């Protein structure tokens, strides 16, 4: 099979930052899909992206489609010939649709009679000839939120396209799209290599562009940024703070990244470090520098998109830009310190949280009520919770948070400490939002845990009540994150909250017209759905989680203890046999009904059933005690000891015997066992694990 390495590059105007990686990655998957569907053998597909291009390289691409064997079933022979043995219109029409004479059709004999069959072969087309249609399909399916048109081009794209490179090894394949024809030329760096770049071969793509001051691979640029930035940070006596998201964003803004250090006035360090870091990272796309103790240093590192002839001018330019941003933040900080958080409470009455859910003040009161009730479960000081909940949203009206919304909670903590509130109350003002992302830290204080749980209960009920349930990629109120955060809080902080009654309490805080109480079970179901995702990420088999959830438990701490006991038990020697027996018991009782009568020992006839019942009676009280104490590992070990007696029972005992009394007694025995199993989980669900 002849193969080539195919390179396709779309040269564009400056792309949106997120589009660089998102469209490159999505395009690689789409190319794999369309080539596979078109029966075109191919190897690895690589994705490339810079601010001015998207590209894909397909290795070991067959130059021709795979030939296809075709078989079509036509009319029955009875319908294909008339009484004179002449071909009917049905037969002639079928032959014509296959492009052959009717005499060329085969006759196949089956159990249902004889049928006309067409067998043929469709020769694969040259991939070069198919490329325009394949390319169009990929372009149409790229996940571009907003497409634009330019000039008289018939096709829309994320940004205007200026050139199209299509190379099969070192040969240009013809393709015309976006109003431009394919060629072997790419774009070099806008400043360092303004003239077009000739790509010699699909395999020399990276090297040819690097010679033109373009690092086309995104991860290579990320690595270069990491190395350069940390090297400069070391020279400054520190270490750069390098969030992965910022590294990737800067890599998507540059084609030839060059790190440059800058400095700012030490007086700005009097502000909270989060303010400076947020300004540097989120607004200036620069990296902060910390010392070995984690203290912020008066430096930053920017990444330029070129090698400047006058690096000092570039440094001064960056310093000139960042200085007024810090000065503004310093002004906000000083102004905010003049007012206690209580002063902002009246303003919350005028701020709409959500049209149907009321003002921020109303949300504050709802959360405050729930949080104060929760103190009985979290052992948090009720007065501290009351104060923290009352002031929870006050910092949203401060000048700093109005300018930097991402600092909500953080500034609340600083302002609370400044006005002399307790450290735990201050910390809770920040912790109410924890965790802020998947895998993020949880609240550490009892007050923070309490406030965070109350906040999430209110947000989930409110979101569902206004029809804002997460769907696909849409989650405007971050309810998915809220649910996962609530799950982590309850489980990892061991808060034995019962979901249903507490969701009902939260729903009861909303005005009746909203009908929030009607959504309690929907929210509960959604939380349990996210709970399954929580365990999937920990590589716990879904069947184990489903077995526990089948008991309809409401306490996530208890559910977690059962899941974590079942997971290792399922890998034990006894588990496979035991689970199979549990499923067999479930099926027998489902078909024949459970028996609530007591087991009569005088009706136990076979040695296997006598032994099984004896084993069960010996362990039953210990099993109940272990379950009552939440010691599910011990309980499962006890149940696991029944694996062999159960095997012997099903091998030697006929449950549905002709003697009705014995039959009922055996069903009663199985009913007792099933009730015991269900003290932990519906073990029959995991029989196929």
UniProtKB/Swiss-Prot annotation:
Q: Does the keyword Cytoplasm apply?
A: yes
Q: What disulfide bonds does the UniProt entry report for this chain?
A: none
Q: Which UniProt keywords apply?
A: Aminoacyl-tRNA synthetase, ATP-binding, Cytoplasm, Ligase, Nucleotide-binding, Protein biosynthesis
Q: Which residues cross the membrane?
A: none
Q: Does the keyword Transport apply?
A: no
Q: Chief localization class?
A: cytoplasm
Record-linked InterPro entries: DALR_anticod-bd, Gly-tRNA-synth_bsu, Gly-tRNA-synth_heterodimer
E.C. number, please?
6.1.1.14
Q: Which GO terms describe its biological process?
A: arginyl-tRNA aminoacylation; glycyl-tRNA aminoacylation
One example of the protein's molecular function in GO is: glycine-tRNA ligase activity
Catalytic reaction equation(s): tRNA(Gly) + glycine + ATP = glycyl-tRNA(Gly) + AMP + diphosphate
> What SUPFAM superfamilies has UniProt attached to this entry?
HD-domain/PDEase-like
Q: Where in the cell is it found?
A: Cytoplasm
Which family does the record assign?
A: Belongs to the class-II aminoacyl-tRNA synthetase family.
Describe its partners and assembly state.
Answer: Tetramer of two alpha and two beta subunits.
Name this polypeptide is given: Glycine--tRNA ligase beta subunit
Q: Which organism is it from?
A: Dichelobacter nodosus (strain VCS1703A)
Q: By which gene is this protein encoded?
A: glyS
């Amino acid at each position: 099979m002849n193969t080539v390495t195919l390179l396709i590059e779309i040269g564009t105007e400056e792309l949106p930052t997120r589009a660089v990686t998102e469209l490159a990655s999505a395009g690689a998957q789409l190319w794999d899909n369309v080539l596979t569907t078109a029966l075109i053998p191919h190897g690895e597909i690589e994705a490339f992206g810079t601010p001015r291009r998207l590209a894909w390289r397909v290795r070991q691409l067959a130059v021709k489609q795979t030939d296809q064997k075709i078989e079509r079933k036509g009319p029955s022979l009875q319908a294909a010939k008339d009484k004179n043995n002449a071909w009917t219109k049905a037969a002639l029409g079928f032959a014509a649709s296959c492009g052959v004479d009717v005499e060329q059709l085969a006759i196949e004999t089956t159990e249902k009679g004889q049928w006309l069959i067409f067998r043929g072969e469709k020769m694969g087309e040259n991939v070069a000839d198919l490329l325009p249609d394949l390319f169009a399909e990929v372009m149409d399916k790229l996940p571009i939120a907003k497409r634009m048109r330019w000039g008289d081009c018939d096709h829309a794209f994320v940004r205007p396209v200026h050139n199209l490179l299509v190379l099969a090894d070192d040969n240009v394949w013809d393709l015309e799209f976006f109003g431009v024809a394919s060629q072997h030329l790419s774009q070099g760096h806008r400043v360092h290599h303004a003239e077009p770049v000739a790509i010699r071969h699909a395999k020399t793509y990276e090297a040819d562009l690097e010679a033109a001051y373009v690092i086309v691979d995104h991860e290579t640029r990320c690595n270069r940024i990491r190395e350069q930035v940390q090297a400069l940070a070391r020279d400054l006596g520190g270490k750069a703070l390098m969030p992965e998201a910022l590294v990737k964003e800067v890599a998507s803004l540059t084609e030839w990244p060059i790190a440059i250090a800058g400095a700012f006035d030490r007086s700005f360090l009097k502000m909270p470090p989060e303010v400076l870091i947020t300004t540097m990272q989120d607004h200036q796309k620069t990296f902060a520098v910390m010392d070995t103790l984690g203290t912020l240093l008066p430096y930053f590192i920017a990444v330029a998109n070129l090698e400047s002839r006058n690096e000092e001018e570039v440094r001064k330019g960056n310093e000139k830009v960042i200085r007024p941003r810090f000065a503004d933040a310093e002004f906000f900080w000083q102004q905010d310190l003049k007012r206690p958080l209580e002063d902002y409470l009246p303003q919350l009455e005028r701020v709409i949280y959500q049209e149907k859910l009321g003002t921020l003040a109303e949300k504050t009161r709802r959360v405050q009520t729930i949080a104060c009730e929760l103190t009985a479960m979290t052992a948090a000081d009720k007065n501290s919770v009351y104060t923290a909940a009352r002031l929870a949203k006050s910092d949203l009206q401060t000048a700093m948070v109005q300018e930097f919304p991402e600092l909500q909670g953080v500034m609340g903590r600083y302002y609370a400490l400044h006005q002399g509130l307790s450290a735990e109350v201050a910390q809770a003002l920040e912790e109410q939002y924890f965790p802020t992302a998947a895998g993020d830290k949880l609240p550490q204080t009892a007050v923070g845990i309490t406030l965070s749980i109350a906040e999430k209960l209110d947000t989930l009920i409110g979101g569902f009540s206004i029809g804002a349930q997460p769907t696909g990629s849409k989650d405007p109120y971050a309810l998915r994150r809220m649910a996962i955060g609530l799950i982590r809080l309850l489980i990892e902080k061991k808060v034995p909250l019962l979901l249903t009654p507490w969701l009902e309490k939260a729903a009861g805080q909303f005005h009746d017209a909203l009908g929030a109480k009607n959504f309690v079970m929907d929210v509960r179901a959604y939380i349990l759905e996210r709970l399954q995702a929580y365990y999937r990420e920990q590589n716990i088999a879904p069947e184990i989680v489903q077995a526990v959830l089948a008991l309809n438990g409401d306490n996530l701490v208890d559910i977690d203890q059962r899941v974590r006991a079942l997971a290792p038990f399922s890998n034990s020697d006894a588990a496979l046999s035991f689970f199979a027996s549990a499923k067999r018991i479930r099926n027998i009782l489902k078909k024949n009904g459970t028996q609530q009568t007591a087991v009569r020992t005088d009706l136990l006839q076979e040695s296997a059933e006598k032994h099984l019942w004896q084993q069960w009676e010996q362990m039953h009280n210990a099993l109940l005690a272990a379950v009552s104490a939440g010691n599910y590992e011990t309980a499962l070990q006890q149940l696991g000891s029944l694996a062999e007696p159960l095997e012997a029972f099903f091998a030697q005992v006929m449950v549905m015997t002709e003697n009705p009394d014995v039959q009922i007694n055996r069903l009663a025995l199985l009913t007792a066992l099933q009730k015991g199993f269900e003290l932990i989980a519906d073990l029959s669900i995991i029989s196929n694990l």
